[in-house]
C-alpha cells in the first residue's frame, strides 16, 4: 500500500529504504527486478525480526504441545521426525531422531524455509505446531502439500493451526496470519 500511494518511492532507492525502515523497522537491500521480489524480501525480514526477537514459545499452552505429544511420538518409534518451524527446538533431546527446521531461529538443526527443505530421506512423523500459518491460501496449500511430500507412507503429522488469537506485539502488525476459521 505504501508503494501504491507513493509510487515515487520506487525511483529513489535511499528514500525507499528509509520508508521501508520507518514503516516496518527492518533494513533490506532495495535493489529488485520486479516488485514482488521486493515485497517478498520485506515479508521475510519482518518474519525474521518477529521470530528472532519478539515471539516466545508457549510449549504448555496447547494440547499437542509438551509432554503429551512427546510421549505420543516416541511411542510410535519413528526412525526420523521433522519439526517444521521448530522455534527454540524445545523437542530436541525429548523426541528421538528429531530434525528441526526453522528459517528464523538459531536453535534449528537446519536453517531453511519449509518449501526449500529437500532431505535425502523422508520422515515417519512430522510436527507443525503453528508454523504453517503465514501468507496466502496458495502459500499455505503449497506448504501443506510439501510437508506431506516429505513423509513416508503411513507417516503421522501433528498439526496445529494459528488459534486466531490476536498477537499483542506491535511487530506482528505487518504479519499476515492465515485465517483458518474463514
Residue ranges, per PLM feature:
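Class I (Rossmann-like) S-adenosyl-L-methionine-dependent methyltransferase catalytic domain
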Residues: 1-117, 158-182
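Short glycine-dipeptide loop
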Residues: 151-157
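Surface-exposed alpha-helical segments enriched in charged/polar residues
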Residues: 71-74, 145-149
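N-terminal hydrophobic or amphipathic segments with adjacent small-residue motifs
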Residues: 79-81, 124, 148
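A short, conserved alpha-helix within the catalytic core of class I
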Residues: 134-146
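Active-site micro-motifs of SAM-dependent methyltransferase domains
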Residues: 116, 133-134
Amino acid at each position: 500500500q505504501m508503494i501504491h500511494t507513493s509510487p515515487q518511492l520506487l525511483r529513489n532507492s535511499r528514500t525507499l529504504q528509509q520508508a521501508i525502515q520507518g514503516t516496518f523497522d527492518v533494513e533490506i537491500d532495495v535493489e529488485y527486478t520486479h516488485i514482488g521480489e521486493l515485497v517478498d524480501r520485506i515479508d521475510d525480514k519482518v518474519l525474521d525480526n518477529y521470530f528472532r526477537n519478539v515471539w516466545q514459545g508457549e510449549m504448555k499452552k496447547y494440547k499437542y504441545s509438551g509432554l503429551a505429544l512427546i510421549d505420543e511420538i516416541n511411542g510410535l518409534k519413528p526412525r526420523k521426525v521433522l519439526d517444521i518451524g521448530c522455534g527454540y527446538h524445545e523437542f530436541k533431546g525429548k523426541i528421538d531422531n528429531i530434525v528441526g527446521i526453522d528459517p528464523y531461529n538459531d536453535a534449528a538443526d537446519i536453517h531453511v524455509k519449509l518449501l526449500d527443505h529437500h532431505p535425502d530421506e523422508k520422515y515417519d512423523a512430522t510436527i507443525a505446531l503453528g508454523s504453517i500459518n503465514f501468507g496466502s491460501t496458495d502459500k499455505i496449500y503449497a506448504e501443506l502439500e510439501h510437508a506431506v511430500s516429505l513423509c513416508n507412507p503411513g507417516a503421522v503429522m501433528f498439526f496445529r493451526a494459528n488459534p486466531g488469537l490476536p498477537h499483542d506485539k506491535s511487530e506482528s502488525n505487518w504479519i499476515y496470519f492465515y485465517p483458518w476459521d474463514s
